[in-house]
From Swiss-Prot:
Residues modified to Phosphoserine: S484
Primary location class: cytoplasm
Protein name: G protein-coupled receptor kinase 4
Chain segments carrying region N-terminal: 1-153
Activity control summary: Inhibited by heparin.
Species whose genome carries this gene: Mus musculus (Mouse)
Sequence positions that bind ATP: L192, G193, K194, G195, G196, F197, G198, E199, V200, K215
Amino acid sequence: MELENFVANNLLLKARLGFNKQTGRSKKWRELLKFPPVSMCTELRWSIEKDFSSLCDKQPIGRLLFRQFCDTKPDLKRCIEFLDAVAEYEVTIEEEQREFGLAIFSRFFKEKSEVPLPEIPPDIVKECKWNLKQNSPSQNVFEECAGIVCKYLSETPFEEYQESTYFNRFLQWKWLERRPVTKNTFRQYRVLGKGGFGEVCACQVRATGKMYACKKLEKKRIKKRKGEAMALNEKRILEKLHSRFVVSLAYTYETKDALCLVLTIMNGGDLKYHIYNLGDPGFEEPRAVFYAAELCCGLEDLQRKRIVYRDLKPENILLDDHGHIRISDLGLAMEVPEGEMVRGRVGTVGYMAPEIINHEKYTFSPDWWGLGCLIYEMIAGHSPFRKYKEKVNREELERRVKNETEEYSERFSEDAKSICSMLLIKDPSKRLGCQRDGVSAVKQHPIFKDINFSRLEANMLDPPFIPDPQAIYCRNILDIGQFSVVKGVNLDTNDEIFYAEFATGSVTIPWQNEMIESGCFKDLNENEDDLSSLEKYKMCSSILRPKRNFFRRLFRRTGCLNIALSEEREPTEH
């Protein structure tokens, strides 16, 4: 029995190591990722939405190919260099920001330049210079300048890009992205745990060697529990979210017996394991604060899409290989319509907010309560209303949540006590995060004084703990109970409509990131002869003008600079 677990663990570790060394790819990986002739992409060329933000910013491969196109033209290359510099300025530490900003201004706005930027009104340049000379210039000093550069790129350069071989190559990648996904796309490894409708196991994409977690939803179990709406809701929410602080959905497919969600694999285990199984219960405060800061970013991303999570607890917060956390298991999450409130008594006993227990309406307040519970538990080593290993029935626990005030030990600093007490206020209208300032008020709490959120969101801060790469942070295979066989349920043709809606294949942004991270994009694109051969397929027909011509981030505080930033945080349509 122990031998079975040992073998399964070794196979998984070998597969994980294979991706890091790019040896996990199938020997036939080039055949699996063979580009079609551009002539096969004609329909795709005309059906794809000609949106500059989507094609050249949000989609990672599109972003890289557009940059490669710009590198062939000095004026466009200059624009990209400016956007890169501004993106770097935005994540520069405050002490160095002014000096770095002045260096950018000197480099790109001096009067005599062989390759000047697109014309920017003198009053905007003057205001930019004045702001930079202040002691603490803001992060968005270059916002208007960057917006003008982005608008310039979205017009004639974008049209020229669509007539180039680089866009032809992009269409070939899109063709590969849209191919059907089946169980044969992956290698399957050991079971990692159990979900509500089936097992979760590790899997590996044959073509790239990329490791994922495959969450299997047994078809008969879904039908017996009438879980179709819940399963589809989780899939749709994951599909529209692209946050480094929430697990990503990369693929959906079906087998004869199951619907499968292929998700970010988190090899570092969950917070519950780390709180209670490695030394004394609880963390040192700096570690708890780091995780709390990343959770704030994750909740902000969810709320930006008007999603309330409703199940924050240590088991649902997972660590990746590098020690960063992500929110997982969005089965209870739901979208809150603009201007409305929702009601629903869902969650886990001991972590549910008072307004949920009382059947009251809410928007995002339960998640700020959940964050308070998590911060408290990470520091104290037990949840706010139940001692470690204390046996308490549901009714008593709910009574404590509604009526009692949590107690604080000497492990809590004044700042830690302050944020927990502000997040655990019974009245949601007075709770931290629930007023007009929302997440900004939480981020500005003194406990986060040493956290640079811009750098955190750009993945530029080192975690306080890095999981052991040789460890398997999950239970032994034999300790993970098996599901019983579902009897008395028959699948019919009516179920096929639901299955077709669920199993839609690759998700654009994660799939393209996989191609880049695995090195497949670089390896296949380095063949310049192959790229130049695309010229003979070049289409001479006029290209439709884009319906929108601004970067998405032009409408945000940080400006439209995502072309130079790392992981995209918004979805794009297939």
